[in-house]
Amino acid sequence: MKRVIAIGELLIDFVPGEKGCALREVSHFERVAGGAPANVVSAVSRLGGSGVMVSQVGEDAFGEHIIDVLQNNGVDTSWVYKTRRANTGLAFVSLDSTGNREFSFFRNPSADLFLSPEQITPELMADGAVLHFCSVDLVDQPVKQAHRRAIELARERGMIVCFDPNVRLPLWDSPADCRAAIREFLPCADLVKLSDDELEFVTGCRTEREAAEQLFAGGCKLLLVTRGAEGSAAYTPGAFAERAALRVPVADTTGCGDSFIGSFLYQLVRDRVTLETLPALAEAELGRYLDFSAGYASLTVQRKGAVMATLPELLAAYPALA
């Protein structure tokens, strides 16, 4: 199976030992390796695919822990660099009674921000099918140009470029700066994944259909929208599918969207969907992919932290997905 390559932040999430209280009230935390791009390729690898992470950590215990966790998940960490210029980033998380999150980030700057375009070479894209990235590392640091270089190389190889903005406003000087960076990179993406609460912020459109048409006009070939408890939807220029959410007990929503898009990308690569065939996916195919990813994400939210399930675990929970 060809590879899904993700570039972006690596950090430690400190997840709370209790739910239903504000971040300032949390009394103890548990260390969990995190970063949305890493969660995505962990999902791909845990499902039996081939995931590659491109990033940088500090020469510290937290960086070593992240690399260990990724390797244990089957992720190729050959392109995870180490630096003494900065420490590995940290994020402290609180959970309300429904499992939704509040973040406090410590990365001023963090090691991933110093990943340079010179560290991104053509060999990275060997046997690559998809390049995935988010917006957290699109700040005005060397890592932004590293993203540009990775996208350029992926384009040269005809890979699918996937962008999940994964908006994290506390990391930006202003919402306007965040929006501008996202919109700068939207034209690079063949597949865009948005949550329903990001849709208007990112696109300026009030409805999914309007957002889809706007993105298609800019070159996007597939839009995925996650709606939280209301399910998910997929749009191509010629097809549409939607699915209701699965009702499960929610422990923690951390990594839910990452597990959704990671399992979706796994299916695209498994089925050898290419840049040319992506916009031609039919309603039935889109629906099957949504069913699979909804099931996979439902397992993630039942666990604390972004812990990705294996394919046998998914099929044991939902045999109809086999």
Which positions does each model-derived feature cover?
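Residues that scaffold the ATP/ADP-binding catalytic core of kinase and kinase-like folds
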Residues: 14, 104, 141, 202, ...
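Conserved N-terminal subdomain of the carbohydrate kinase-like
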Residues: 50-133, 316-322
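Active-site metal-binding loops of divalent metal-dependent hydrolases
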Residues: 10, 165, 259
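Acidic, amphipathic alpha-helical patches
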Residues: 121, 182, 250
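Conserved beta-alpha-beta core of the PfkB/ribokinase-like small-molecule kinase fold
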Residues: 130, 136-213, 220, 230-231
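Glycine-rich phosphate/adenosyl-contacting loop at the front of the ribokinase-like
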Residues: 1-76
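Short gly/ser/thr-rich secondary-structure transition/capping motifs
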Residues: 109-118, 171-177, 205, 278-280
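Conserved phosphate-binding/catalytic region of the ribokinase-like
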Residues: 2-5, 152, 208-322
